[in-house]
């Protein structure tokens, strides 16, 4: 995803990245393949890129709802406003992490945000428990991409890894404690991706 310095102030704030980091330069997020975000490739008749629409910075609400449904009983239902709230939260979280990663790139005078930058940002922002599992996932992802590129198919590698993290992977439950406003602790179930389905990757353990 390429963010050019020509983007408007409103667009930059929507993405959670200040103008100081993108003014006069651009940052590129590359997943080690040549695939580009088609959204940024659309140009109007004057040759300028279209402004981001609000829905363009959100994950598809159907995908968000599908993940949410995995965390509730089969008979449970989720209201539309709840789905929209989580959809916006996910977008804010992505912008939050990416903004921190872009700051590191800015300090090191780089223009490409890589996987290590994201891991560094998550650690800096207090998401340490996710860093080690994500390091292993990133390693496996790169190995898969490298292996498939060697036999002529980066897309196949991505598809193959996606199959290992398919929808049914969100079935494992991890016990966790939830501290309520009155100081009481409640037991809840946290649904996470089945990291053990990828060789060498372990589940996140909550204490």
Curated annotation (Swiss-Prot):
Subunit note: Heterotrimeric transcription factor composed of three components, NF-YA, NF-YB and NF-YC. NF-YB and NF-YC must interact and dimerize for NF-YA association and DNA binding. Interacts with C1QBP.
Q: Name one GO molecular function term.
A: sequence-specific DNA binding
Cross-link Glycyl lysine isopeptide (Lys-Gly) (interchain with G-Cter in ubiquitin) placement: 140
What Gene Ontology cellular-component terms does the record carry?
Answer: CCAAT-binding factor complex
Q: Mention one GO biological process in which this protein takes part, according to its record.
A: regulation of transcription by RNA polymerase II
* Swiss-Prot/TrEMBL domain comment: Can be divided into 3 domains: the weakly conserved A domain, the highly conserved B domain thought to be involved in subunit interaction and DNA binding, and the Glu-rich C domain.
Region Disordered: start-end pairs: 27-52
Q: Does the record bear Ubl conjugation in its keywords?
A: yes
Q: Which InterPro entries match?
A: CBFA_NFYB_domain, Histone-fold, Transc_fact_NFYB/HAP3, Transcrpt_fac_NFYB/HAP3_CS
Q: How is it modified after translation?
A: Monoubiquitination at Lys-140 plays an important role in transcriptional activation by allowing the deposition of histone H3 methylations as well as histone H2B monoubiquitination at 'Lys-121'.
Family, according to the entry, reads as follows: Belongs to the NFYB/HAP3 subunit family.
**What are the boundaries of the region B domain?**
53-142
State the CDD domains in the record: HFD_NFYB
Q: Biased composition, Basic and acidic residues: where in the chain?
A: 39-52
Region annotation (Subunit association domain (SAD)) ranges: 86-97
Name this protein carries in UniProt: Nuclear transcription factor Y subunit beta
Role summary: Component of the sequence-specific heterotrimeric transcription factor (NF-Y) which specifically recognizes a 5'-CCAAT-3' box motif found in the promoters of its target genes. NF-Y can function as both an activator and a repressor, depending on its interacting cofactors.
**Main localization of the protein?**
nucleus
The region called A domain is annotated at 1-52
- Where in or outside the cell is it found? Nucleus
Q: Where are the annotated segments for C domain?
A: 143-207
- What keywords tag this UniProt record? Activator, DNA-binding, Isopeptide bond, Nucleus, Transcription, Transcription regulation, Ubl conjugation
Q: Which residues bind DNA?
A: 59-65
